[in-house]
Amino acid sequence: LYWEDGKWVETKPLEIHKPLTYPEVGPKESYLLHHEEIESLVKNYPTIKRARFWMTFGQQYLTYLDCIQNLGMSRIDEITYEAPLADNPNEKVKVKIVPLQFLKAVLPNPQDLGENYDGQTSIGCRIRGLKDGKEQTYYVYNNCSHEAAYKETGMQGVSYTTGVPAMIGAMMFFKGLWRKPGV
């Protein structure tokens, strides 16, 4: 889902992808996804002609997603499972589970994986438009080392770049700094 010419355009999951080059990271296969941030952008800047969100995934991750989907484990509806009792395998009990919630319960907590992350995130915004009658393109970005983020907070870079700016914004708001001109 992305915004173009005043309307939302729907696509199939991971249908649109292409290599994009990220500063200090290099080229990565990038996938067009929906993200809440573009909803906020088009609401607050109604003259935007196109707003899209791209994200990268490693091939192994995409293979895991395909496997989870193919096994029916990405379902969010409740199913009934007939399970043998631990103390009496011959006796069975019917248990209701939501497959995706079950996966969440048995897979490692993402918070516990940060120590093994390496490399860096690269989050940016490419802005293209007219300024003084001439087409201009700007790219504002932030890179974050997973290792440095983990050393500082015990979290990997994606969590760091999500949580730290929100915390700083909240702190500035409550100290009255956010309301000053230019902020």
Regions found by a protein language model. Name each.
Residues 1-183:
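C-terminal catalytic/substrate-binding lobe primarily of soluble NAD(P)-dependent oxidoreductases
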